[in-house]
């Protein structure tokens, strides 16, 4: 089953909408973004979430002490590192880690093997001067069969109900990550979310899912 993460949750109304749609992995952005959220607001939402919900914090070049403080305060399950964090940044962090890689060309994937302490890779579009959340797609052929050392691939970057099916059939990711693609006028939209999930379901019917590492189980992230 292809997992789905909906990122950029800003309030309880959006969180409840996502949960009601059947998605159990929510992303909270603690970096400069139109969808950024304060730790206090994120914690308030997270304390209301039902069991078996996975929370992912998105960070961009956050100082380690600050990242650990926010992760502990908000009780985050997974940390998504979406900046230029080097492999050694990951050492000693207790939460499960996802390292985002911005894909410009085939050479963009050369650094994957250095990140031995992460549990998965999120592949996003490379846009000059932007860490992520651009709503821009990239050439999925570049990451088809990417050598990740057996670690799960989470596909992001401009995914929408209209294109996610094709992306899944080509890349066969462990999970897909969406934010702006399920929004209308900058807010999460139930009809767009439902259409996205239906497109994922239909795409799954056309291929057999590979077995994924249990380290990221629960991930159901563009911010």
From Swiss-Prot:
MF (Gene Ontology): phosphoribosylanthranilate isomerase activity
User: Does Chaperone count among this protein's keywords?
Assistant: no
GO BP, one example? L-tryptophan biosynthetic process
Gene name, per UniProt, is: trpF
Keyword annotations for this protein?
Answer: Amino-acid biosynthesis, Aromatic amino acid biosynthesis, Isomerase, Tryptophan biosynthesis
Q: Does the keyword section mention Nucleus?
A: no
User: EC number(s)?
Assistant: 5.3.1.24
**Name of the molecule in the record:** N-(5'-phosphoribosyl)anthranilate isomerase
* Enzyme class (EC, first level): isomerase
